């Protein structure tokens, strides 16, 4: 393939030539590449899809020539790229890729995805919408019989094979200390109750039994709370053939609609404890405004069924009977059978009621059918494995781990034995900075009267620290582990080349000479407390030494308020690598290496060993193949097993999936025991895994949000770096960040993703400190600020607008993200999914959680990407009869289990799904173009196991045999495969899809656009790309002048209008303050009329701007206005009089004056909206809190009209005592007549009454 490296100037000339149009004659779904097309390149050098693919993907919406782009927009983009050293940099241009795609199901991508989303959602969505709300009566007594028993009210119980309704609510209970297999289960349908009992509690001895639900043959919805746990106990789910059941999780629905972010959870739990304490003490405080500082506390709940049922349905679940299932004796279940079945049935009832409340809310939050269809796909993951290999993996990893523990402990014991030999050499150990910290006092040998050693003596003659390592007199070897407190002393660890010292009050510390104290303070180290300092002085004094330094605390990963109590955890590994933490002992080095190798298994072993592995040998009738025509039940498959991962499909507020083992599994590392976990997922004979990693998924989404402002890919600096940046040229985002910070490229990735997820400069400073502890606070702050000034930009606090970013490579992006986060109802740009109620702006006051809301906008869009991809794949699999099903998705990775004969077709389906998904993102953000270099996966992996790269050997301490490599194909290699064509489609699928109606859905950004004027869009964009604040101020003035001049021109007035004219009109009341988020700028003028849907000329993107209405504090103060007028000599006589007029109110009127309008009144009104009456009355009481008794007292005591004394020259002294004395001895004014007093009192009472009515 020809590769041309061209500069942007050449590209501008190329785009003005119309690309060669080629008549497409290839047979449908042929994979022959069409190389006759010319590259299509945009004005900033980004290559777009070839004309053939462009026409197939975007239809009539796409294909606009780049010469039609606004010259002004391109000038601004060019300026931004130049300022960041990207304009003119080389870009990669390749031959256009061209091959036929399956036709879209509609005229646009949105119509296409709506229809296939409905196709994949039905009939399940209809089942949910038609779900019963009235529950049938529960039976008075349950029968303990193996299998299913159906209970219909008014009829005798009957044994059935499985529930036969289309929707059931389901719950399973297990004797989890005996077996992972189910013990009993209950289900509820619209007509009956069902109970399933394991043969184990009905006279059998083997607990290995699964629950039949006929999920292979019947389309049905099975509802449960954390239903993945229940699904793992369903018999038919242990098949390679795809299930027809939708296991719908109410926990996921709750989290997506009402969940809490990680920053909210601690506050929420603290508030819950406070409420529980008030209930227990029977304290019921009055409602106050302070109780509503965080309204989100009242619109969310934790995720357990007990908390969710309490929050949504006011149901108090008693979970005490759950403890019976912790028994190791099945007779406990048998003896309490009726009680425990009713306990399970109560959970079913609560789950049903919770679903009735949550499901309609979820559909409003996530209205696009793809969101529901994607949830169905992620709810049926399976992980095939081989039973013997799985057991070998567990045994090998555990054995090596235990061996490593023994090795570590043996080396520690050897160190101890070497040290204890020094017990008779005090001159040596007392001078050693580590050994001198040990207690060397000895207990002498006790002798009887006969001179024989007394019995039951514990190591007489040995030092106390050594004796404490022997718990009893029978202990032969010291009992010690790597976590023992004494280990850092024995290993002779040092921090910053200073021996570590233990303090009860401050944890591990280190000594710093007095002359270097300020240096270490500047490095952000924290002094140990005074008690620790005093203890160290006493210790050194007792040793006959002089204390020559000050103790500083070894930093803790969680911050300076925590004490470091263990220096050998994973958090301190990088300090060893950087030489900050060292050891003087060679044996200690070996022990640390052994400890490091076992760290992964030590942390993950319980989660891995608890996996529920179901082998085919126990259920020979299951494990059916993907094809209904063939079977896997033969001698080669007796070793097969399946793990159903306990995935919560929407386990976070960003709707990401959560699972504690597989979704957090690390990649295989040569020095980590058990790190080859993912390779234990193995395809059965005749099958393979086909999958891909989405390249920089969330970074691309974020950059696309910024590029959409210019309506061109690569228009912003971050967009250009994301698409064309390279390590060799130093133009990719991570390399540029690494250059600024002076760190590695991998470390720079952490800073970049943290910043895009909403983290601030403080986060960067703390992270820098962790990577390089030798940096001072001032240095880290300076470097972090430099990074954020280059990326996020500088801040502008306008007199008319709120704060915004300008001048950085990511300023436009962050202004846009903050704009989304600041909306009343933030939505993801593509599928329009709404944010959880706990993060909606109306529920946030004291805490804004802005970083969490920005993070939500990006990560939730990443979930939209996954749902679109899954939905598209399911459609293509059905349409072209591919033998494939989803295996697992790990954030930006996706893997399908595919028959060997269909592996290349499945790979092509993935590439097609990706181009549709990327194009959908672009179109919904207003760009009907797609860059060629991100349209396809960089490679599709075809492998026998799951691993990060197909060419990884996955050699670890627990796996000495290299795994055969797989196959990785890019789009061109895939097109060269003759068997990669999708083949003949199933026409019935398209006929079903076409039956679904399309409802036009206004793109989210277009919906936001209606709030902004074209003038603002034009000027605000120009302000963001400026690097000089003076240019930003100039553009602000021009913006006001242009907007108002247009208004004057419409009225026939040709006078020019400036910013100062605007300010005067605001003061005179002729104009209201400019409202940036208003329908248009001219709303401030009386009788002004303008079209809300007016668009910018020449394809200017109609886009929401980034900030809300400026509040009163953002408008210049009166004195500032006056100064500006004086400077311009534009103060007229009317304003002079206004500024110098005298106040006509009396002192008492001024004393009790209350303003009941303006911003404060509006805020009070807004706070009272949708609030309880008690809260409204309390707010009103505080708002109108005029001390009436004080007013009456002042009137009756003739304080209503005393005159102000003329000002006198101040004395030299300003003593507060003298001032107080003057106030005490001031003369009273003469008394007024009683008639005046009564009249004033009546008028004041009338005014107060009127004010309250207002």
From Swiss-Prot:
GO cellular component, one term: gamma DNA polymerase complex
UniProt-annotated stretches for the region Disordered: 1125-1145, 1202-1240
MF GO annotations: 3'-5' exonuclease activity; DNA binding; DNA-directed DNA polymerase activity
Catalyzed reaction equations: DNA(n) + a 2'-deoxyribonucleoside 5'-triphosphate = DNA(n+1) + diphosphate
The keyword Nucleotidyltransferase appears for this protein: yes
EC numbers, comma separated: 2.7.7.7
Domain of life of the native organism: Eukaryota
Biased composition (Basic residues): 1219-1231
Main localization, broad class: mitochondrion
Record-linked InterPro entries: DNA-dir_DNA_pol_A_CS, DNA-dir_DNA_pol_A_mt, DNA-dir_DNA_pol_A_palm_dom, DNA/RNA_pol_sf, DNApol_Exo, POLG_palm_dom, RNaseH-like_sf
CDD domains, per the entry: DNA_pol_gammaA
Keyword Nucleotidyltransferase: yes
Localization (cell): Mitochondrion
Pfam families noted in UniProt: DNA_pol_A (PF00476), DNApol_Exo (PF18136)
Start-end of Basic and acidic residues biased regions: 1125-1137
Compositionally skewed regions (Polar residues) per UniProt: 1208-1217
Signal sequence extent: none
Coiled-coil ranges per UniProt: none
Cofactor: Mg(2+)
Keyword tags: DNA replication, DNA-binding, DNA-directed DNA polymerase, Magnesium, Mitochondrion, Nucleotidyltransferase, Transferase
General function of this protein: Involved in the replication of mitochondrial DNA.
Family of the protein in this entry: Belongs to the DNA polymerase type-A family.
Other observations noted: In eukaryotes there are five DNA polymerases: alpha, beta, gamma, delta, and epsilon which are responsible for different reactions of DNA synthesis. Present with 377 molecules/cell in log phase SD medium.
Protein name, UniProt field: DNA polymerase gamma
Species the sequence originates in: Saccharomyces cerevisiae (strain ATCC 204508 / S288c)
Name of the gene: MIP1
């Amino acid at each position: 393939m020809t590769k041309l490296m061209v500069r942007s100037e050449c590209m501008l000339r190329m785009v003005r030539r119309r690309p060669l149009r080629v008549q497409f004659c290839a047979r449908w779904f042929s994979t022959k590449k069409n190389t006759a097309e010319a590259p299509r390149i945009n004005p900033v050098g980004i290559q777009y899809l070839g004309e053939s693919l462009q026409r197939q993907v975007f239809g009539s919406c796409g294909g606009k020539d780049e010469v039609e782009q606004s010259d002004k927009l391109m000038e601004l983009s060019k300026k931004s790229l130049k300022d960041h050293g990207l304009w003119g940099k080389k870009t990669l241009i390749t031959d256009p890729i061209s091959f036929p795609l399956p036709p879209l199901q509609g005229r646009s991508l949105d119509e296409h995805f709506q229809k296939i989303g409905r196709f994949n959602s039905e009939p399940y969505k209809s089942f949910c919408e038609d779900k019963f709300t009235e529950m049938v009566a529960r039976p008075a007594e349950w029968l303990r019989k193996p299998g299913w028993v159906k209970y219909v009210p008014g009829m005798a119980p009957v044994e059935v094979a499985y529930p036969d309704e289309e929707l059931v609510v389901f719950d399973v209970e297990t004797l989890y200390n005996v077996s992972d297999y189910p013990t009993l289960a209950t289900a509820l349908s619209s007509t009956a109750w069902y109970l399933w009992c394991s043969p184990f509690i009905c006279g059998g001895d083997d607990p290995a039994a699964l629950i039949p639900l006929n999920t292979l043959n019947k389309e049905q919805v099975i509802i449960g709370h954390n239903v993945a746990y229940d699904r793992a106990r369903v018999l038919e789910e242990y098949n390679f053939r795809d299930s027809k059941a939708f296991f719908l999780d109410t926990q996921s629905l709750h989290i997506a609609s009402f969940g809490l972010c990680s920053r909210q959870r601690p506050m929420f739990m603290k508030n819950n404890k406070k409420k529980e304490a008030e209930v227990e003490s029977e304290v019921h405080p009055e409602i106050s405004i302070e109780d509503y500082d965080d309204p989100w506390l009242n619109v969310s709940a934790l995720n357990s069924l007990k908390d969710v049922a309490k929050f949504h349905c006011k149901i108090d679940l008693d979970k005490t009977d759950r403890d019976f299932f912790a028994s190791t004796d099945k007779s406990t279940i048998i003896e309490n059978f009726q009680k425990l079945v009713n306990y399970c049935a109560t959970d079913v009832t609560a789950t049903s009621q919770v679903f009735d409340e949550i499901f309609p809310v979820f559909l409003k939050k996530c209205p696009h059918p793809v969101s529901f269809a994607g949830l169905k796909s992620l709810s049926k993951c399976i992980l095939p494995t081989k039973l013997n290999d799985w057991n070998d993996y567990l045994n090998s990893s555990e054995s090596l781990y235990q061996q490593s523990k023994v090795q570590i402990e043996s080396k520690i014991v050897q160190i101890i034995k070497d040290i204890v030999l020094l017990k008779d050499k005090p001159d040596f150990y007392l001078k050693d900075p580590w050994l001198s910290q040990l207690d060397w006092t000895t207990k002498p040998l006790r002798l009887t009267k006969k001179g024989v050693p007394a019995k039951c003596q514990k190591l007489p003659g040995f030092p106390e620290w050594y004796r404490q390592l022997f718990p009893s007199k029978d202990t032969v070897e010291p009992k010690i582990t790597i976590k023992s407190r004494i280990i850092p002393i024995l290993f002779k660890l040092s921090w910053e080349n200073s021996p570590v010292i233990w303090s009860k009050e401050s944890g591990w510390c280190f000594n710093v000479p007095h002359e270097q104290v300020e240096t270490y303070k500047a490095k952000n180290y924290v002094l140990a407390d005074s008690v620790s300092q005093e203890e160290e002085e006493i210790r050194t004094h007792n040793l006959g030494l002089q204390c020559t330094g000050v103790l500083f605390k070894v930093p803790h990963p969680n911050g300076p308020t925590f004490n470091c109590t263990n220096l050998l955890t994973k958090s301190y590994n990088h300090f060893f690598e950087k030489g900050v933490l060292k050891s003087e002992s060679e044996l200690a080095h070996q022990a640390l290496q052994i400890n490091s190798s076992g760290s992964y298994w030590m942390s993950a072993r319980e989660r891995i060993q608890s996996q529920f592995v179901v082998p085919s040998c126990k259920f020979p009738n299951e494990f059916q193949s993907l094809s209904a025509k063939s079977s896997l039940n033969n001698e080669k498959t007796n070793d097969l097993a399946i793990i159903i991962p306990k995935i919560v499909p929407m386990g976070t507020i960003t709707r990401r999936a959560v699972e504690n083992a597989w979704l957090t599994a690390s990649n295989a590392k040569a020095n980590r025991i058990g790190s080859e976990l993912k390779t234990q997922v193995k395809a059965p004979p005749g099958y393979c895994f086909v999958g891909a990693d989405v390249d920089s998924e969330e970074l691309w989404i974020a950059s696309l949000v910024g590029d959409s402002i210019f309506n061109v890919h690569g228009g912003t600096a971050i967009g250009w770096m994301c698409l064309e940046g390279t390590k060799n040229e130093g133009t990719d985002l991570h390399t540029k960040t690494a250059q600024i910070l002076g760190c590695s490229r991998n470390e720079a990735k952490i800073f970049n993703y943290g910043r895009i997820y909403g983290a601030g400069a403080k986060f960067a400073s703390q992270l820098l400190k962790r990577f390089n502890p030798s940096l001072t606070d001032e240095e880290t702050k300076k470097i972090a600020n430099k990074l954020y000034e280059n990326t996020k930009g500088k801040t502008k606090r306008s007199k008319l607008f709120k704060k915004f970013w300008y001048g950085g490579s990511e300023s436009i992006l962050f202004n846009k993200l903050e704009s989304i986060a600041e909306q009343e109802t933030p939505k993801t740009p593509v599928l329009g999914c709404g944010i959880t109620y706990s993060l909606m702006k109306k529920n946030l006051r004291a805490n804004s959680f802005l970083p969490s809301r920005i993070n939500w906008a990006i990560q939730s869009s990443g979930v939209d990407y996954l749902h679109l991809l899954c939905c598209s794949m399911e459609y293509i699999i059905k349409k072209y009869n591919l033998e494939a099903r989803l295996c697992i998705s790990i954030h930006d990775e996706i893997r399908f289990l595919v028959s060997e004969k269909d592996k290349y077709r499945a790979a092509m389906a993935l590439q097609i799904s990706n181009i549709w998904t990327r194009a959908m993102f672009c179109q919904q953000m207003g760009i009907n173009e797609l860059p060629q270099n991100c349209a396809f996966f960089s490679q599709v992996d075809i492998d026998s196991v799951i691993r990060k790269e197909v060419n990884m050997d996955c050699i670890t301490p627990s796996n000495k045999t290299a795994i055969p490599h797989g196959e990785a194909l890019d789009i061109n290699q895939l097109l060269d495969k003759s068997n990669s064509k999708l083949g003949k489609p199933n026409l019935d699928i398209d006929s079903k899809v076409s039956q679904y109606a399309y409802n036009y859905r206004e793109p989210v950004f277009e919906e936001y656009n209606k709030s902004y004027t074209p003038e603002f869009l034009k000027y605000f964009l120009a302000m963001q790309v400026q690097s000089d604040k003076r240019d930003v101020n100039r553009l602000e003035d021009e913006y006001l002048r242009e907007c108002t001049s247009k208004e004057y021109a419409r009225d026939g007035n040709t006078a020019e209008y400036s910013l100062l004219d605007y300010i005067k009109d605001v003061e005179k009341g002729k104009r209201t303050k400019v409202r940036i988020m208003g329908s248009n700028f001219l709303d401030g003028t009386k009788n002004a009329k303008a079209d809300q849907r007016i668009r910018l000329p020449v394809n200017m993107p109609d886009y929401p701007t980034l900030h809300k209405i400026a509040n009163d504090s953002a408008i210049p103060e009166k004195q500032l206005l006056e100064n500006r007028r004086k400077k311009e000599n534009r103060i007229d006589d009317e304003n002079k009089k206004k500024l110098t007029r005298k106040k006509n109110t009396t002192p008492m009127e001024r004393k009790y004056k209350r303003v009941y309008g303006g911003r404060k009144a509006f805020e009070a009104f807004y706070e009272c909206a949708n609030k309880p009456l008690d809260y409204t009355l309390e707010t009103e009481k505080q708002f109108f809190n005029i001390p009436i008794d004080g007013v009456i007292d002042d009137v009756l005591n003739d304080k209503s009209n005393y005159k102000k004394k003329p000002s006198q020259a101040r004395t030299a002294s300003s003593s507060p005592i003298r001032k107080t004395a003057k106030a005490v001895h001031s003369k009273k004014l003469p008394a007024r007549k009683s008639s005046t007093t009564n009249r004033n009192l009546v008028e004041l009472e009338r005014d107060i009454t009127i004010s309250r009515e207002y």
